[in-house]
Amino acid sequence: MASKAEKIVAGLGGIDNIDEIEGCITRLRTEVNDPALVNEAALKAAGAHGVVKMGTAIQVVIGTDADPIAAEIEDMM
């Protein structure tokens, strides 16, 4: 079974679509290459409480485990 981080990566359009990622208290702040590949429903199914899209900047609201999940995703990159 895929980890929460792997599901979030898939919702963000795959590891190759993620340009930058960092944890910020309760959010994952990301820059993606193609925002059209971001699947908000998949992110919510992975446990996101909300998704904020601003061009290529995507914020995934996931709660207090944002920092460890960001670190896990960075290790995949």
Swiss-Prot record:
Residues 2-77 form the PTS EIIB type-1 domain. It catalyses: N(pros)-phospho-L-histidyl-[protein] + N-acetyl-D-glucosamine(out) = N-acetyl-D-glucosamine 6-phosphate(in) + L-histidyl-[protein]. Induction: Induced by GlcNAc. InterPro entries: Glu_permease_IIB, PTrfase_EIIB_Cys, PTS_Glucose_EIICBA, PTS_IIB_1. Disruption phenotype: Mutant is insensitive to GlcNAc. Its EC number is 2.7.1.193. The active site is at residue 24. PROSITE patterns: PTS_EIIB_TYPE_1. It comes from the Bacteria. Keywords: Kinase, Phosphoprotein, Phosphotransferase system, Sugar transport, Transferase, Transport. One of its GO terms (molecular function) is kinase activity. It is an enzyme of class 2 (transferase). The phosphoenolpyruvate-dependent sugar phosphotransferase system (sugar PTS), a major carbohydrate active transport system, catalyzes the phosphorylation of incoming sugar substrates concomitantly with their translocation across the cell membrane. This system is involved in N-acetylglucosamine (GlcNAc) transport. This is PTS system N-acetylglucosamine-specific EIIB component. It comes from Streptomyces coelicolor (strain ATCC BAA-471 / A3(2) / M145). The gene is nagF.
